[in-house]
């Protein structure tokens, strides 16, 4: 999550107001998106913004993951994939897929374990790359639900201004991999939502065999 008023005036407070409430009740794991990386790689335009933002995450004891994996109790692994700016160009000037090999370069894949693997990837990408790496759950967002949604058609625009994005919001499955794309809370590029309610996704993980909650 990243909230700013504009690229000339930063205002992190709405974001951290929510995060402060979340950390009171849950462990929070944070992955970068396109806004964070824009601050990170364009220091001249946003001097000190990224360092300030990351420092605030640390103050709240939020686990900030960048192309890394951590193993939790109960056989759960959480990983985060950090996508570079080539994935976020406007119109057709952006990558829309990620290969199984690229995924393995960014996160730990253990083919010999039965652990449940959750991957945070800001932009929802092709599910086959994750499925081939036996990743169980991918949590994404970025598309803001397509901003404008039409009956029987679905999402109209992506933030890259391409039309009819595939993974615009909801649940998608390929083999044993599930991808959830949240419609999120804010707007992007076109400051408009039409037939597209903001949302926070709540996931309950349940063991397949004995129907007991994992977390």
Regions flagged by a language model, labelled:
Residues 3-10, 37-51, 86-96, 152-164, ...:
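Acidic/histidine-rich helix-loop elements
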């Amino acid at each position: 999550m990243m909230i700013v008023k504009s690229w000339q005036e930063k205002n992190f407070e709405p974001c951290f107001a929510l995060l402060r409430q979340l950390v009171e009740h849950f462990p929070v794991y944070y992955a970068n998106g396109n806004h964070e990386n824009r601050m990170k790689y364009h220091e001249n335009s946003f001097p000190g913004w990224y360092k300030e933002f990351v420092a605030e995450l640390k103050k709240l004891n939020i686990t900030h993951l960048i192309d890394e994996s951590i193993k939790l109790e109960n056989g759960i692994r959480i990983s985060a994939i950090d996508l570079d700016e080539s994935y976020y160009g406007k119109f057709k000037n952006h990558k829309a897929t990620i290969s199984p090999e690229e995924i393995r370069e960014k996160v730990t894949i253990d083919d010999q374990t039965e652990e449940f693997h959750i991957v945070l990837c800001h932009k929802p990408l092709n599910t086959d790359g994750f499925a081939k790496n036996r990743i169980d759950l991918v949590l994404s967002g970025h598309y803001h639900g397509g901003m404008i949604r039409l009956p029987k058609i679905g999402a109209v625009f992506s933030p890259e201004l391409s039309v009819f994005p595939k993974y615009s919001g909801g649940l998608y499955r390929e083999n044993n991999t599930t991808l959830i794309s949240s419609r999120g809370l804010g707007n992007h590029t076109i400051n408009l939502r039409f037939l597209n309610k903001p949302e926070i996704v709540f996931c309950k993980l349940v063991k397949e065999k004995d129907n007991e909650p994992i977390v």
